[in-house]
Amino acid sequence: MAKQSMKAREVKRVALADKFFAKRAELKAIISDVNATDEDRWNAVLKLQTLPRDSSPSRQRNRCRQTGRPHGFLRKFGLSRIKVREAAMRGEIPGLKKASW
């Protein structure tokens, strides 16, 4: 199990990313706009740097919903490889069965 503080930190990052999504997209559009003046683009870069670091979606880490484990995460299930295996062995995931050939 991951520490509760790590799970809480991840929840905080998701909330900040949602909160600043529009502002961040607006500033990035100005920065990538070739028709904008250099001064406007530079000001947009400076404003983007003033936003909270955790508001960037790239700071988020996929974690297992049950354990909070950051490694071995399977996106399709939202679980770590260990919990997917346990659920599959109990038959809780429809259509998923152990390979045998």
From Swiss-Prot:
One of its GO terms (cellular component) is small ribosomal subunit. GO terms for molecular function: rRNA binding; structural constituent of ribosome. Keywords: Ribonucleoprotein, Ribosomal protein, RNA-binding, rRNA-binding. PROSITE patterns: RIBOSOMAL_S14. One of its GO terms (biological process) is translation. It holds the Pfam family Ribosomal_S14. SUPFAM superfamilies: Glucocorticoid receptor-like (DNA-binding domain). Part of the 30S ribosomal subunit. Contacts proteins S3 and S10. Belongs to the universal ribosomal protein uS14 family. Binds 16S rRNA, required for the assembly of 30S particles and may also be responsible for determining the conformation of the 16S rRNA at the A site. This is Small ribosomal subunit protein uS14.
